[in-house]
């Protein structure tokens, strides 16, 4: 689903019918928004104001908060953080290799976004004041919907009706646009955040697998329990980031391959 839906919607004269069909086939709930990056205009929306689990897509916002602290002079990407074995959680492919020497803040952000390293995310989350601190950052930049209440890996539980660690497609798209185009971050930090998304190494089975030659993509995926799956992406033809696409899926019995 997540691989084919954006391009199918883009090409379809009836994009909402395409989304409804996908939702029916998966027997779950799909939330999607396609937004013009330059203007912020909504191009396509389906369940865009309904809550969905963020899963690992929150890591982009987290690193945006870290970069805001860097811009303010309160953090440095070169600062080394040391941690212990007991700080590691499931799926930490990068951080587990650096117990002896630690990792810099910049390296942790790269690991969190490009490899979805969960321990890296938790270590970064601690630097911004935990889940409550990240939620406060979101409120400061005008996102009154998105909320983080838990750490990795509990935040991926995706319980029905649970508002914890959720967002809406519309809110996530608007927040991404603010981080990447407004003055919330310096131009240098915007370029860095976008580059980490360009360098994503765990999104191969999704949109990247069907993208036409010459298209730009920068993305971050997420996976959770109870059929939850998600992706946030910037993409466009002629190797230019023209639009933001956010897709979330929940409450489906579909396999991971089918969700992808």
From Swiss-Prot:
Q: Which domain of life is it from?
A: Bacteria
> Mind listing the GO biological process terms from this record?
beta-lactam antibiotic catabolic process; response to antibiotic
- Name the PROSITE patterns for this protein: BETA_LACTAMASE_A (PS00146)
Where in the sequence is the active site? 56 (acyl-ester intermediate), 154 (proton acceptor)
Q: List the disulfide bonds.
A: 63-109
Report the enzyme's class at the first EC level.
Answer: hydrolase
The record, for Gene3D superfamilies, names: DD-peptidase/beta-lactamase superfamily
Record's miscellaneous remark: The class A beta-lactamase family has a specific amino-acid numbering system, sometimes called Ambler or ABL numbering and often misspelt as Amber. A multiple sequence alignment was used to derive a consensus sequence and then the consensus was numbered taking into account insertions and deletions. This allows use of identical numbers, e.g. for active site residues, despite differences in protein length. UniProt always uses natural numbering of residues, hence there appear to be differences in numbering between this entry and some papers.
Chain's role: SHV enzymes hydrolyze broad spectrum cephalosporins notably cefotaxime and ceftazidime.
Q: What is this protein called?
A: Beta-lactamase SHV-6
Specify the species. Klebsiella pneumoniae
What is the gene called? bla
């Amino acid at each position: 689903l997540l691989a084919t839906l954006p391009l199918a919607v883009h090409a379809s004269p009836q994009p909402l019918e395409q989304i409804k069909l996908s939702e029916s086939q998966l027997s779950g709930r799909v939330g999607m928004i396609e937004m013009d990056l330059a203007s912020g205009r909504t191009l396509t929306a389906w369940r865009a104001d309904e809550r969905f689990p963020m899963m690992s897509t929150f890591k982009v916002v987290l690193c945006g908060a870290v970069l805001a602290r860097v811009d303010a002079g309160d953090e440095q990407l070169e600062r080394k953080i040391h941690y212990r074995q007991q700080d590691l959680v499931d799926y930490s492919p990068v951080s587990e290799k650096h117990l002896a020497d630690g990792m810099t803040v910049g390296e942790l952000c790269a690991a969190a976004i490009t490899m979805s390293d969960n321990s890296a995310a938790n270590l970064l989350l601690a630097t911004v004041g935990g889940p409550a601190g990240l939620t406060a950052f979101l409120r400061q930049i005008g996102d009154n919907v998105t909320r983080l209440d838990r750490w990795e890996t509990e935040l991926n539980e995706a319980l029905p009706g649970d508002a914890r660690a959720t967002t809406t497609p519309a809110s996530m798209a608007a927040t991404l646009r603010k981080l990447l185009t407004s003055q919330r971050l310096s131009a240098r930090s915007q370029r860095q955040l976008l580059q980490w998304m360009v360098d994503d190494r765990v999104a191969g089975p999704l949109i990247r697998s069907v993208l036409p030659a010459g298209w730009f993509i920068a993305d971050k995926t997420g996976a959770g329990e109870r059929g939850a799956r998600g992706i946030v992406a910037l993409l466009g033809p002629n190797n230019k980031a023209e639009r933001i696409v956010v897709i979330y899926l929940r409450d489906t019995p579909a396999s991971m391959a089918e969700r992808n």
